[in-house]
Regions:
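FabD-like malonyl-/acyl-CoA
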Residues: 2-141, 186, 190
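Positively charged, low-complexity/disordered segments
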Residues: 236-238
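Alpha/beta catalytic cores of group-transfer enzymes, especially the acyltransferase/condensing modules
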Residues: 11-13, 40, 100-234
Length: 238
């Protein structure tokens, strides 16, 4: 049998109803949602299961995403499946850290709750945006962006043929039109409320250090891949 990787989604993959089947069907998954409601100042179950607009607002999305992902993880673990490696796209790295036992679920969900608040406060909803650019090489994108007025930059190299741009809402929209004119097959606005992975959020990252300093961090029982370094990590405190 080949090696198994547990990979977790990032912000933008959220939807109303996520995790509800697991909550209704499995005690181990229900326990995760119940724990989230106990340790946070928001009703995560209501956020995930009932129709609402808050699920797409950063300060709420991140805690909801991590809760739903870990709820599914716990059932997979209960089935006896074990990973050889864990990884996560952006926010999903926190779920990977839980899966690798680097931090507890309770700590992770509290950290991402504060992370979401800091990010939202730094760039209020509507002022920043992201779009996925399909069918265009990074060199071509890099040639277009400097001519756009405002802040817009490449944020994620998702895979060959799919690159994400991020920045001020107006600049991202203008860049999208310019990129389509320059040959991009499609430019798709992402379902996020902020300019993630852009210089606009640097102040939020600096403030998050004050939150992380009190978190207990362990060496991983399962290696995980760092988003920052794009390499396998076997030490927790780095």
């Amino acid at each position: 049998m080949g090696k198994i990787v547990f990979m977790f989604p990032g912000q933008g993959a959220q939807y109303v109803g996520m995790g509800k089947d697991f909550y209704d069907s499995f005690a181990c998954s229900k326990e995760i949602f119940d724990k989230a409601n106990e340790v946070l100042d928001i009703d995560v179950k209501k956020l995930c299961f009932e129709e609402n607009e808050d699920i797409n607002i950063t300060e709420y999305t991140q805690a909801a995403m991590v809760t739903a992902s870990v709820a599914i993880l716990k059932k997979i673990e209960e089935m006896g499946l074990k990973p050889d490696l864990t990884a996560g796209l952006s926010l999903g790295e926190y779920c990977a850290l839980v899966a690798s036992d680097v931090m507890s679920f309770e700590d992770a969900v509290k950290v991402v709750r504060q992370r979401g608040i800091l990010m939202q406060d730094t760039v209020p909803a509507g002022e920043g945006a992201m779009s996925a650019v399909l069918g265009m090489k990074k060199e071509a994108i890099e040639a277009v962006l400097p001519d756009v007025e405002g802040i817009v930059t490449i944020a994620n190299y998702n895979c060959p043929g799919q690159i994400v741009i991020s920045g001020e809402s107006k600049a991202v929209a203008e860049a999208g039109e310019a990129l389509k004119e320059a040959g991009a097959k499609r430019v798709l606005p992402l379902k996020v409320s902020g300019p993630f992975h852009s210089p606009m959020l640097k102040p939020a990252g600096e403030k998050l250090l004050d939150v992380l300093v009190d978190v207990e961090v362990n060496d991983p029982k399962v290696p995980y891949v760092s988003n920052t370094r794009s390499e396998e990590r076997r030490v927790g405190k780095e």
